[in-house]
């Protein structure tokens, strides 16, 4: 059992290697899904009283720091000449705002958050798996702005930090592989 734990740690760590010039080159060529967890939020707020996705006053929202992080991510993507096509987002205010600040647009989509099925429904994340596994043509990348839990549910550990991006290679038929991750603090050093 102990050996299994070490192997799992090893393979998880190697699957989540630090970003490199190769990863940036691949992103410039396109064909990937960039799954971004929303940027920094105010954890003193919660979603328990929200009446709809448009009810931003009763949701956990971005902080000023989170807004600046989203703008910075967008500026780095532009600086690195990473082509962005569709920008899909969970309909929550924090994910929509993160996407709009970073990429200038966002299309609300329930599948991006892993819903609307009930939490215990085994098919809850089928729509998200389809988004992550659908072929993206070369020359552009698709962005999904969403949450940490749905991605962890379909891709496994480790959890994405706020503002972290998992670079996903779609493989079709609900299959995909995570080829890298980019933390907020990684962007300035990427070339």
Model regions and ranges:
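Positively charged n-region of N-terminal signal peptides that target proteins for export
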Residues: 1-5
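Hydrophobic h-region of N-terminal signal peptides that target proteins for export
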Residues: 8-17
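All-alpha RGS (Regulator of G-protein Signaling) helical domain and cognate RGS-like helical scaffolds
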Residues: 111-121, 125-133
């Amino acid at each position: 059992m102990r050996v299994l734990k070490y192997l799992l740690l090893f393979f998880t760590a190697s699957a989540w290697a630090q970003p490199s010039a190769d990863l940036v080159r691949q992103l410039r060529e396109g064909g990937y899904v960039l799954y971004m967890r929303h940027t920094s939020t105010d954890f003193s707020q919660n979603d328990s009283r929200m009446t709809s996705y448009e009810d931003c006053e009763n949701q956990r929202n971005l902080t000023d720091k989170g807004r600046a992080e989203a703008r910075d991510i967008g500026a780095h993507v532009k600086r690195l000449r990473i082509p962005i096509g569709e920008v899909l987002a969970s309909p929550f205010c924090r994910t929509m705002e993160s996407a709009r600040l970073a990429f200038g647009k966002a299309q609300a989509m329930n599948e991006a958050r892993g819903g609307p099925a009930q939490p215990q429904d085994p098919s809850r994340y089928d729509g998200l798996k389809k988004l992550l596994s659908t072929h993206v043509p070369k020359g552009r990348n698709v962005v999904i702005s969403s949450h940490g839990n749905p991605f962890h549910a379909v891709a496994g550990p480790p959890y994405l930090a706020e503002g972290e991006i998992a670079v996903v290679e779609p493989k079709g038929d609900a299959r995909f592989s995570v080829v890298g991750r980019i933390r907020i603090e990684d962007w300035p050093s990427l070339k």
